[in-house]
Amino acid sequence: MNKTITPSIDSINRQWYLVDAENQTLGRLATEVASVLRGKNKPSFTPHLDTGDFVIIVNAEKIKVTGKKGMQKLYRRHSGRPGGMKVETFNSLQERIPERIVEKAIKGMLPHNALGRQLFRKLKVYKGSEHPHSAQNPQVLSITTNELVK
């Protein structure tokens, strides 16, 4: 009888990927990045282990959403105090903190436990095209989307 081989933490080879979010659709980008963070693109994927890679996302302020989501999509946060609910639209949050939009979309697609928090720490999102991780020699990860042509 064959036994399932669980990769050891030392044997996991982690790579760094660079993703340009310019003119990408938010959800389609987030699903691909979440899959790479989990390690589902590797043959050694194990659901209960962190086998994923590091992902750097640049140009977060140029990400797109379809339809009227720019005005209608709401982001909520609460200070924990009575009456402390703050509501903000996609457009206003994109002007203020565009990194948070991408981070929140990807975080919702990761496991909601300690493993998900560990995976989320391997995501680096930046507003502009510059990032401080050039020493890691990130590979460019191209994400192609099937867009409808009007």
From Swiss-Prot:
Protein name: Large ribosomal subunit protein uL13
Gene that specifies this protein: rplM
Family recorded in the similarity comment: Belongs to the universal ribosomal protein uL13 family.
Alphabetical keyword list: Ribonucleoprotein, Ribosomal protein
Comp. bias (Polar residues): 134-150
MF terms (GO), sorted A to Z: mRNA binding; structural constituent of ribosome
One GO-annotated biological process of the protein: negative regulation of translation
Assembly with partners or alone: Part of the 50S ribosomal subunit.
Ribonucleoprotein listed as a keyword: yes
HAMAP family: Ribosomal_uL13
Pfam families: Ribosomal_L13
Record bears the keyword Ribonucleoprotein: yes
Gene Ontology CC terms: cytosolic large ribosomal subunit
PANTHER family registered for this protein in UniProt: LARGE RIBOSOMAL SUBUNIT PROTEIN UL13M, RIBOSOMAL PROTEIN L13
InterPro entries: Ribosomal_uL13, Ribosomal_uL13_bac-type, Ribosomal_uL13_CS, Ribosomal_uL13_sf
Biological function: This protein is one of the early assembly proteins of the 50S ribosomal subunit, although it is not seen to bind rRNA by itself. It is important during the early stages of 50S assembly.
UniProt region (Disordered), positions on chain: 130-150
